[in-house]
Amino acid sequence: MAFRDQPLGELALTIPRASALFRKYNLDFCCGGKQTLLRAATRQALDLDVIESELAALAETPLEKDWQAAPLAEIIEHILVRYHDRHREQLPELILQATKVERVHADKPGVPKGLAKYLSLLHEELTSHMMKEERVLFPMIKQGMGSQAAGPVSVMESEHDEAGELLEVIKHTTNNVTPPPEACTTWRALYNGINELIDDLMNHISLENNTLFPRALAGEK
């Protein structure tokens, strides 16, 4: 099966573990989910045949949940429990760990200087963002008013882009979330947590941008 002409966001939602594969190749399937695999791979000079082969192998595994066919209210509930609640747990702990690592290892060349600040910015942005979704956009969609939500959706997508930009800064600050050989247990735990956060947030944004929002705007109830 040829995947090159399909949007990244669609592939991430329909092929198990495709999102992890895209992360490995640094392909943006959340905020950049509307671009085709061909375009995204070409822009980074990646071997498209290799990526398609890996996708074909992943596609043989049954999909646990087809969110493209799920009711919108079920998608919203999943987002609230799986992502909103989880982000509220993740970020405060990561900020504490980053603050400790920066303080204790301040004299080491591999220390992620500024990481706690960037995580705090992301925490502030996401806290405000999720509150707006929970108080304004999600109730509109659940009440069958999604087709009238173009304004709120546009704002949410713009904020998704801003969160994506912060993730790139965080990846740059942490050497693509790769701990140096001398990293202590706390440092490694911090980077494991950041990798989990990035995976969660990218899947979260992808589900909203590429499934929930388009279907709501199209008038689905």
Curated annotation (Swiss-Prot):
Record flagged with keyword Isomerase: no
GO cellular component, one term: cytoplasm
Keywords associated with the record: Cytoplasm, Iron, Metal-binding, Stress response
Pfam families, alphabetized: Hemerythrin, ScdA_N
Cellular location(s): Cytoplasm
Gene3D superfamilies the UniProt entry points to: nmb1532 protein domain like
Gene Ontology MF, one: metal ion binding
GO biological process: protein repair; response to nitrosative stress; response to oxidative stress
HAMAP family: RIC_YtfE (MF_01606)
Family: Belongs to the RIC family. YtfE subfamily.
Assembly with partners or alone: Homodimer.
Function comment: Di-iron-containing protein involved in the repair of iron-sulfur clusters damaged by oxidative and nitrosative stress conditions.
Name of the protein in question: Iron-sulfur cluster repair protein YtfE
Taxonomic source organism: Cronobacter sakazakii (strain ATCC BAA-894) (Enterobacter sakazakii)
Gene: ytfE
